[in-house]
C-alpha cells in the first residue's frame, strides 16, 4: 500500500588510516544482475565513542571471497525505532513523529580486527549512538579500484527482509563507468498487503481490525507486526511516520511512503497536488490548491456507483451513490 523506501549509497571517499586498504578488491566489472554487499545486524546497543560493536555474524562473507578482516570497510545504519503519536485513532495526527530515537544515524567505519564470530573492532570511535532494537544494519562494503557496469549489467541489493537488506553501498577509488543499471527499486521498506475484507464507512486512522481498512506500509517506526502489537494500528489510513497508510473502504487505494523533506510541509498526507485538478482540490481541501506538500502521495477514494464529474461534485456528495467517493485513501507518509 506504499512505495518502498530505498537507501542507496554509491560512495567515492578517502579514509585516512594506517590500516586503509582502498581498492583492495580490485577492478570490478558487472555483466549480469549482482549483489556485492553482505549484511548482518547489531545485537547490543552501541554508544558514541565505542570502538567495538556486537553483531549477529562478524564474518560478513556472503558475496565476498573471504571473511571480514582488518582494513575492510563497513556501513552502520539504524533503520527503525522512531516513536509516534498513537493517542487517538480517529484523527490524522495519529502517526506523527515524536522522537527518532537514533533512527537515521549512520556512518562508515574501517575494521581494525575481528576477534570472534560476534565482535567487530573499529579503528575509529563511533560518532553516534545506536539502539539494537531499532534494527541496526551492518553492511560490508567492497573497496574497488574501479567499477564498470556493462550494458545489461545490474548492480543491486538484497531485498529488505525486516532485519537486513535494502541497501547498496560501494567504495570506488578510481573511475566508475555505468552503461547498465544501478537499481534497488522495490527492495526497501515493504508495502502493506492487499486486503479485500474492509467494509463501507471506515473512518479510523489506526485499527487492528482489517474490516476497517487495508494494511499500512512499513517505515521507520517498524513493520506491520510492530504496528499491531504495540500501536493497535496495523490497518487503516493513518500514516505511521514515513510509511504510507492503507485505504479505508472498497477501492480506496493505499498511499505512498515518504522520503526526505520538510515535516512542517506535510498536510494530511496529500502529497503534491496536480495543478490540472485544482478545481477538484478546491471542492475538497481548498488550502491545498497550488501547494506542494512534503511526503508521500495520498491514496484514492472509496467507490461510487455513478460516473459523476469530480470537477463539480465534491467527495461525499450523495449523487455519487455507492460509498459516495469519500476521501478515505491512505495518507501519504511523513517526511
Residue map of PLM features:
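Autoprocessing Asn-cyclization modules and mimics
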Residues: 21-106, 115-123, 151-165
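Bacterial Sec-dependent N-terminal signal peptides
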Residues: 1-22
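Glycine-centric low-complexity/flexibility signal
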Residues: 25-26, 86-90, 131, 146-148, ...
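Short solvent-exposed strand/turn elements
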Residues: 115-136, 170-173
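Short coil-to-beta-strand transition motifs
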Residues: 99-108, 140-146
Amino acid at each position: 500500500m506504499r512505495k518502498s523506501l530505498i537507501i542507496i549509497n554509491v560512495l567515492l571517499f578517502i579514509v585516512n588510516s594506517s590500516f586503509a586498504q582502498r581498492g583492495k578488491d580490485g577492478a570490478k566489472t558487472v555483466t549480469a544482475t549482482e549483489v556485492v554487499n553482505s549484511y548482518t545486524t547489531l545485537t547490543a546497543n552501541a554508544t558514541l565513542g565505542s570502538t567495538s560493536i556486537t553483531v549477529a555474524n562478524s564474518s560478513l562473507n556472503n558475496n565476498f571471497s573471504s571473511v571480514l578482516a582488518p582494513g575492510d570497510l563497513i556501513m552502520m545504519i539504524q533503520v527503525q525505532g522512531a516513536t509516534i503519536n498513537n493517542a487517538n485513532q480517529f484523527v490524522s495526527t495519529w502517526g506523527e513523529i515524536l522522537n527518532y530515537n537514533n533512527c537515521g544515524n549512520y556512518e562508515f567505519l574501517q575494521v581494525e580486527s575481528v576477534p570472534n564470530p560476534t565482535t567487530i573492532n573499529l579503528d575509529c570511535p563511533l560518532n553516534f549512538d545506536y539502539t539494537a532494537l531499532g534494527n541496526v544494519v551492518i553492511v560490508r562494503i567492497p573497496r574497488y579500484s574501479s567499477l564498470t557496469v556493462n550494458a545489461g549489467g545490474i548492480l543491486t541489493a538484497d531485498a529488505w527482509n525486516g532485519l537486513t537488506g535494502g541497501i547498496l553501498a560501494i567504495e570506488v577509488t578510481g573511475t566508475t563507468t555505468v552503461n547498465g543499471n544501478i537499481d534497488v527499486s522495490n527492495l526497501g521498506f515493504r508495502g502493506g498487503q492487499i486486503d479485500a475484507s474492509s467494509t463501507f464507512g471506515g473512518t479510523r486512522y489506526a485499527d487492528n481490525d482489517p474490516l476497517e481498512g487495508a494494511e499500512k506500509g512499513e517505515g521507520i517506526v517498524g513493520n506491520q507486526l510492530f504496528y499491531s502489537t504495540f500501536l493497535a494500528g496495523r490497518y487503516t489510513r493513518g500514516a505511521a511516520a514515513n510509511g504510507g497508510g492503507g485505504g479505508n473502504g472498497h477501492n480506496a487505494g493505499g498511499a505512498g511512503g515518504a522520503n526526505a523533506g520538510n515535516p512542517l510541509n506535510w498536510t494530511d498526507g496529500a502529497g503534491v497536488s496536480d495543478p490540472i485538478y485544482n478545481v477538484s482540490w478546491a471542492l475538497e481541501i481548498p488550502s491545498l490548491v497550488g501547494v506542494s506538500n512534503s511526503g508521500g502521495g495520498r491514496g484514492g477514494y472509496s467507490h461510487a456507483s455513478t460516473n459523476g464529474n469530480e470537477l463539480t461534485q465534491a467527495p461525499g456528495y450523495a449523487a455519487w451513490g455507492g460509498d459516495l467517493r469519500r476521501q478515505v485513501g491512505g495518507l501519504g507518509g511523513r517526511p
